[in-house]
Amino acid sequence: NMDALICALAVIFMHPGAAGVYYGTEIPLEGGYDPDCRRTMDWNAVQGNTRVKEMMARLAQIRRHEAIRYGGVRFYAKDDIFVLERSHGNKTLRLNVSEHGGADIRQRGKILLCYNYKDKTADGFSFVIEEES
């Protein structure tokens, strides 16, 4: 499920520490458990499926935010929404993730990045990264 993968990547990129992604995630390269996890990179596929690559690049840019670089972390659930907050000083970045459609998953901040979220409505697996000062 491509939408679930992109939401999982948002959690990985917002989580403290190095973002643990493997080569091939950006295309996404199929694989299984060891030893099937070491498939050869499909370089032809790198030119296609830009949705995951573009989202990973945008998430990598957000990792430069001071709240992610220096801030603490807090996890909680609000209704059916998983929330990951990173705060430093007066800046807070909040990742709101939903796997259900129809909900307004945004809380109150300025939207920096979203996926499957339009007109204040989540559509299936979706997320919003918002900033508060």
Q: Where are the regions a protein language model picked out?
A:
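Carbohydrate-interacting/catalytic domains
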Residues: M2-L9, M14-V21, T25-S133
